[in-house]
Structure formats: C-alpha cells, structure tokens
Amino acid sequence: MRVTDFSFELPESLIAHYPMPERSSCRLLSLDGPTGALTHGTFTDLLDKLNPGDLLVFNNTRVIPARLFGRKASGGKIEVLVERMLDDKRILAHIRASKAPKPGAELLLGDDESINATMTARHGALFEVEFNDQRSVLDILNSIGHMPLPPYIDRPDEDADRELYQTVYSEKPGAVAAPTAGLHFDEPLLEKLRAKGVEMAFVTLHVGAGTFQPVRVDTIEDHIMHSEYAEVPQDVVDAVLAAKARGNRVIAVGTTSVRSLESAAQAAKNDLIEPLFDDTQIFIYPGFQYKVVDALVTNFHLPESTLIMLVSAFAGYQHTMNAYKAAVEEKYRFFSYGDAMFITYNPQAINERVGE
C-alpha cells in the first residue's frame, strides 16, 4: 500500500485556526460504514445517534504547555518540545537548534531565561533534559511553557489556548497534543448523554509529538510508528465487556481512544480485552482486524497521515476517501480545531484492496 493512496486535495482555507465559539456547535459528518452513506448535521446530533447502554470511551489525558524557548548557555537559540515527562526533574524532548546541544550542555529556558537545565543524554532524535530547579517539571512547564499548537495552526499560542486546546474532562497531564475529537464535548452535552443512559469510560493515552510526524516512507508497511504511553484500567475493561454482553456498542471518542482499546485487545491473553499500562506502537491501516470499537467520533485528519489510514481501516478505504471529498466540497473545517465525523464500523473494510 502506498502512502500517496491516502492523499487528497485540501484548500488552505479549510484549515481551522480557532475552534468554534461553542464547543458542541461544530458540524458533524456521519458516515455509515457498511453502506458509505453520508449525513450532514451538527455535533449535538450525536444525542440521537447513540442508544441507552452504548459506551463512550474518552481519553482523559491533559495537554501540558510543552513548548519552551531559550538558548544554550554557550549561545545559540533553542526551541524545546517535550515528548514526555520522565519524572519530577527530567523530560524527553525534541530540540531545535542550529547546532544540537551535546551531553552536559547547559540550557537557559523561558522567555526570561530564568530556568536552568542540563542536556544529559541523547536517544536518537530525542534529548534527555534535567531541570536544576526546586519545582517539579509540571510546575516549571506551567510557568514558562507555551501550548504546543500543531504546526498547521499557523499562529502563536494565546492564553485562551490553555483551555480551548483541552477537553473539559482532561485529568492526567502528559500529552503534547489534544485528543481533538473530545474538544467538541461540553458539560451540557455530556449531561444530556448521561441522562439518555449513555455509559462513559476513560482511558489515558499521552499523545506524543510523533502524532504530527509525516510518514516518510513510500510504502505504508515500512513505516515505524512512534511510541506513546497508554492506560486502559480494569473499570474500562469491565465497561467494554458489559456493553458487548448486553448488545450495545463501544464508541471511541478519538483515534487515541481507538488505539488504546485495540492495543489492550491485542495484548490480551484470555479475554477480548484486558487492562493495559504500557507503551503502545500500534499502527492501524487497511487490513487491520478491529476487535473492540464499533463506532468512532473523530476529526478530519491530514492527507497521508497515519490517522486517515486508521479511519480507512475502520470505515473502508473507498468510503473514507469519498467522505473526505464530500467534506472538502461542503467546506467542513479541518484538523484539530475543525469539525467532526461520526463513523460506524464497516465489517467489509478488512477485505478491501487498496491501490490495486
């Protein structure tokens, strides 16, 4: 399968740079997996699409202000993007500099260069950085960090992004990108879903900066997926098994929830799904056998990204590309701050041959 099979024309004007004034007021394109039929509506239509007893699975990760600016003590500006927090004093990060710092290099971070840190080791493309400060890593990031808006949102981060680029139910700090499908849920909508009898469960997947890395190979099968930490606790496993047992659907909110659930299913030894507390490198593309997820709420993804491949594996390649073509024609807003899709599973997707 070729990466170019997942390309589509997207006018620059359709990339959303700010979210809708009201979270749940975005548009919703519904794709019926088995037939490919499309329905245009509003995000709150989700209320009518879910049944009492259906299980919504959210990702409760919280985005950290992961972008830091500063310089090497020896001179030369640097930009640091935290990939993950290792402990209270250390981070693993991408560093942009005219010349990469060497182990032992002293870094002065923050717009006022008030934070002192040391680059202690290099692991491939990533740098280990230790803060020489009394405060915890999270406190330091909250005080000097910038929200790591995706590269295609072409503007500096603003104070408002600290909440806008965060789901209302976010709880566990550690992501450098928001699980964006969740951005459309506000408290009134969550309340109405609960009142209808829709069940809710929360996994945690700390989205890494790798989510924005382009696929740099021609053939999909050659792509090495980045690694992210995921937690699927026992209560989520119980909720999934209970929903399946009573004939209800498991609906993943976002591709990160999909990857968490399907990773836990892949690692399970005895049951359909078992608890998972581990890094995952799961790469879902056409031909993948889904085991857990029956429906998906997701945003519109970048051409040739691993995420449009995941959706194609779920709804079917042809149905997915047709939906994206319609979305462009109907001027839906794309990417992190854009509109959403509701997609039901297409069991025939696994048999589809792509690019032949």
Curated annotation (Swiss-Prot):
Pathway: tRNA modification; tRNA-queuosine biosynthesis. GO terms for molecular function: S-adenosylmethionine:tRNA ribosyltransferase-isomerase activity. It comes from the Bacteria. GO terms for biological process: queuosine biosynthetic process; tRNA wobble guanine modification. Its EC number is 2.4.99.17. One of its GO terms (cellular component) is cytoplasm. InterPro entries: QueA (IPR003699), QueA_dom1 (IPR042118), QueA_dom2 (IPR042119), QueA_sf (IPR036100). Keywords: Cytoplasm, Queuosine biosynthesis, S-adenosyl-L-methionine, Transferase. SUPFAM superfamilies: QueA-like. It catalyses: 7-aminomethyl-7-carbaguanosine(34) in tRNA + S-adenosyl-L-methionine = epoxyqueuosine(34) in tRNA + adenine + L-methionine + 2 H(+). It is found in: Cytoplasm. Pfam families: Queuosine_synth (PF02547). Monomer. HAMAP family: QueA. Transfers and isomerizes the ribose moiety from AdoMet to the 7-aminomethyl group of 7-deazaguanine (preQ1-tRNA) to give epoxyqueuosine (oQ-tRNA). Belongs to the QueA family. This is S-adenosylmethionine:tRNA ribosyltransferase-isomerase. It comes from Escherichia coli O6:H1 (strain CFT073 / ATCC 700928 / UPEC). The gene is queA.
